[in-house]
């Protein structure tokens, strides 16, 4: 499951060089159709339940696509791999990854978005509840190193001086909150396995609801593949949208398909996670604009916000370097309009 928000600028540059070494490796081919490999930055899990449903139910085959997920991990820079041309599409955990990549000159562009509202949140316990950003004043907030900029953004958005909050750098588990080392801790609301340790009464303060609007699980490709194979991307989006619609209508059956594909996953945990995931995958926007859509204005706000936070060492990227609506427009009538 994706947990890291986005790579550092150093890892983007280092990963780009490493990926070029393998750029000449042959792509997978099959009589089933045109290969589409989706590179992740993490180990495959519940975030890909829609793609797994589409694969196992034959939706990709209907589009003459031979689909495969390429898992990531701690030492795999998925953005750099896709940018090198080795694989056709990719998915990152959070939209800032693609803004930073565009700023560094990597030729990748977002063509659709999975989670319309990022499930990143600040978690607290009833003994010291944090329900609003103002409740953070005078408190210890545990945040991963890559998430420091988001805490800064949240505080600025809500008019809170940074020196009024004590920032504590933590790892990826929730233990510091349970032990009382911190009063709040960051994570994904969809990561129900990690949240178990907090018990049933924990509180979640979503980043999105408090002014910092990021996208999660955006899909991206290279500028070259976008130009040469828009029909393949459109087919990929149609099939994936059908898969997610199936998950929404049949969550338990979809979890069964997921666990059949990845037997290491725990069915009960994935059932708990899928209900949270569907809440951010399908919103009022998808009801009117279709699954996978995004608002260009939200993207521009993100670019402006990260520029104000001085995150673009190589310069602020232009909107058309970060995203394209071309494939969404091609599939406007085909993507499920569900909310």
Feature-to-residue mapping (PLM):
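Conserved C-terminal helix/tail region of periplasmic/extracytoplasmic solute-binding proteins
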Residues: 299-339
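A residue-level marker of the well-folded mature domains of exported/periplasmic proteins
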Residues: 69, 166-167, 179-180, 184, ...
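Structural motif detector for alpha-helix initiation sites
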Residues: 9, 132-133, 319
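Short linear loop/turn motifs
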Residues: 68, 76, 271-279, 317-329
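Short, glycine-/small- and polar/acidic-enriched structural segments
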Residues: 31-179, 183-189, 200, 205-206, ...
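Periplasmic-binding protein-like
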Residues: 114-124, 196-229, 237, 276-281
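N-terminal export signals
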Residues: 4-5, 11-31
